[in-house]
Structures are given as C-alpha cells and as structure tokens.
A protein has these predicted regions:
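Active-site histidine-anchored catalytic micro-motif
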Residues: 1
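Long, compositionally biased charged/polar accessory segments in the mid-to-C-terminal portions
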Residues: 38-93, 108
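Short runs of predominantly hydrophobic/aromatic residues within well-ordered alpha helices
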Residues: 31-32, 65, 69, 88, ...
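Intrinsically disordered, low-complexity, mixed-charge
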Residues: 9-51
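Short, small-residue-biased leader/transition segments that mark boundaries at the very start
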Residues: 4-5
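C-terminal amphipathic alpha-helical interaction region
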Residues: 99-130
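Fungal-biased detection of long, low-complexity, Ser/Thr-
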Residues: 76-85, 96-101, 118-122
C-alpha cells in the first residue's frame, strides 16, 4: 500500500516539475540544477513545491531568460519556418538590447507551441498564462 502512495506522489512531483521546470530555469539556472539534482532523491511533493517557490522569487537575469528561451526554442526550431527562425533571432537580440520584455519572448514561444502543437511546451506554466499562479 505504501508503495502505491509513493508512486502516486512521485507522479505528482514529476508532473509539477514538467509544468514548472522552464519557469524555474527562466529565473535561475542554479536553482534549476539544484532542483533537478534533488529530484533524484526522496523528496515530498511539498518539499519540491517549496524549492520551486523559492526559485521563482529570484529576479530573472538577461542570461537566465535567454537560456530558458534557447531551451524552449530547441523544441520549436525544427518545425518553425524560415521567417519564424529569423524572428526568433531578432526577438532575442531585441530582448538583450532592452527593446522588448520577457513576456514578448514567451508570447512568441507560446504562439509557436500552439501553432505546431508542441505538447511538452504547452504543458509548461511559463508559456501557459491561463495556468500561471
């Protein structure tokens, strides 16, 4: 019986991480790595949620936003057309130069994830504003 409960909680932990990993990465690669490594141990759902909540308090840097953008773009670049690839480069450059904000980058990724039905990204809270806390 105990094993069934553990598997169930583990499933919730994996779902939570699947939904929040890019949100965490957007805020801090160090927190992302720390949580990823901690997930290899026996943590409770509550502990994982607490770690995520703490990570989300960190102010995103230009580098952390670009890193998260690049990771998510990796799921889209194969299906994106040439115009979208060019737009991706321009948007990233505009972000680095302070011409656009983080949300503009995320909206671009969300639009393409929807267009190409990239479920892995669509499950991410950072791209799914309707599910953001």
């Amino acid at each position: 019986f105990r094993r069934v409960l553990f598997r169930s909680e583990r499933g919730y932990i994996e779902q939570l991480w699947r939904e929040e990993k890019y949100h965490v990465l957007l805020h801090s690669q160090q927190s992302y790595q720390m949580i990823r490594n901690a997930l290899k141990t026996d943590l409770s759902l509550h502990q994982v949620q607490q770690m995520i909540d703490v990570a989300l308090l960190i102010e995103p840097s230009i580098g952390s936003v670009c890193n998260a953008f690049d990771h998510m773009w990796g799921y889209l670049k194969k299906c994106a057309n040439e115009e979208e690839r060019q737009q991706s480069k321009l948007l990233k450059a505009d972000f680095i130069n302070g011409k656009i904000d983080t949300q503009t980058l995320l909206d671009f990724l969300a639009e393409l994830a929807n267009k190409y039905d990239v479920q892995y990204l669509l499950q991410s809270r950072v791209l799914n504003t309707k599910r953001k806390r």
